[in-house]
Amino acid sequence: MPTTYAHYKCGKEVLSALPRPLQNSIEAHRELFDIGLHGPDILFYYNALKKDPVNEQGHTLHEQFADEFFHHAVEVIEKAKDPAAARAYIYGFICHFALDSECHPYVEKIMQVGRVSHNEIEMELDRMMLTEDYHDPLRYLTAKHIHPKMEYAEVIAPFFKDVTAEQIYKALKGMVFYHKLFLAPTSGKRKALFLGMKAVGKYDSLHDIVMSVKPDPLCQKYCKVLKRQYSGAVPLAASLIVQYQKKLFQDTPLPERFHETFGAGEEWEKLRL
């Protein structure tokens, strides 16, 4: 499914850019860090095919200023049974914020100029990155690093409002399930998926989350723009994690960069591609 690999790859590069002691502390809870790389997106997979307060919170968080979430996260970590595990998760979450906030304004602009969907643009970015890493975009399960466990859900749930560990666990299982469902390396499965989408009236909203057989030439130049933004998100995330660690241990101010949303913001129309 699109977008997932870009966030995972970004997180790996950020981890390599961090100071060694911080790398080691994250590696001790690597699977939680890897889940954190997907930020609020994991909530989308709770009862994914219908509106629900849990998956709606995923959308709401994308539109809110992130500093509100990260201020709350400080309190959650202070009260956590395993603060090191909670920190590893939130460091991954910071990576998600950095990549989203760097790329989404340009995604919005590309949608306006290029007349392609959000999902299609991000699908093509995932394809580019998978290909660069010598993976077959049609066959690679991009959620293979997600390992649903109740012990992880118990760490994650307090970061969200009125969400239980059981709901987080179900969301994580849903994430893996839907990535497997929409992985379509054969023409037979593709036809079955598209027929099923049409049967339930979801084709228009879902068909472009299935990796297309061939890249869209229109998106190639736009992917280069997003790759540039991706390159900037890696050092940004590393810097924000180090600063957030100081916030946690030394009570320094939260970086002003968190006073942005995960989404496109309000200035995207002024951007030039």
Q: Model-found features: residue ranges?
A:
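N-terminal leader/auxiliary helical segments
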Residues: M1-I90, I94-L273
